């Protein structure tokens, strides 16, 4: 098979990375995508570093065996822990995702920037380095959100449970003083509407999906690996849980407006 005709692999600790996959499919509609969600082992954000590395390499091997031409690690935790190791071990373009702090700063809105993420993402050196770039000039506050990915893995993306979770997390803030909220986990875009409700739509909500998808397109173009023929690509979803419910939820989230 011509390398251009090979699919693009996507990986996340569960269904969250589908938020990034949606953006990539809009940007690259001719491409085929294979998505692997490791919901059996979700969430990654509370696991030990070595376990996250092992799970990430297992998922990557699964997709490599399917013949992918590029890999998107659509998981903030896996990116922060393993992206450098992956690039050293696999000879394909590998794109990661990180909290979109730079776009939030560049809005120049003043006020507080809140970064919602898993405890592990916030504890990793990669995030500390990102914070170091801006902490002297910006009011940035990390907000760990343990338990939120697990709710989304159950298909709970709206309603009282999500509202009350977010209401509790944001109760210590003055909504008028929040300029931006950075979604530092790929699960979180699915609860964006409830987040707007909780914060009275005062803050700009930013995630890294578009930036990651744009980088994927850039790398494929530079490597002459884009599909050229006029066609509509397809998306195939796999999950380590191997039950129909999680696959159905995955496609439901992919098609969610």
UniProtKB/Swiss-Prot annotation:
Annotated positions binding substrate: 12-13, 44-45, 76-77, 186-187
Reaction it catalyzes: L-glutamate = D-glutamate
UniProt GO MF annotations: glutamate racemase activity
Catalytic residues, chain numbering: 75 (proton donor/acceptor), 185 (proton donor/acceptor)
Domain of life: Bacteria
Gene that specifies this protein: murI
Transmembrane segment boundaries: none
UniProt-listed Enzyme Commission number(s): 5.1.1.3
Keyword terms: Cell shape, Cell wall biogenesis/degradation, Isomerase, Peptidoglycan synthesis
InterPro entries: Asp/Glu/hydantoin_racemase, Asp/Glu_race, Asp/Glu_racemase_AS_1, Asp/Glu_racemase_AS_2, Glu_race
An annotated GO BP: cell wall organization
Upper lineage: Bacteria, Bacillati, Bacillota, Clostridia, Eubacteriales
Stated name of the protein: Glutamate racemase
PROSITE patterns for this protein: ASP_GLU_RACEMASE_1, ASP_GLU_RACEMASE_2
Pathway: Cell wall biogenesis; peptidoglycan biosynthesis
UniProt similarity note: Belongs to the aspartate/glutamate racemases family.
Cited function: Provides the (R)-glutamate required for cell wall biosynthesis.
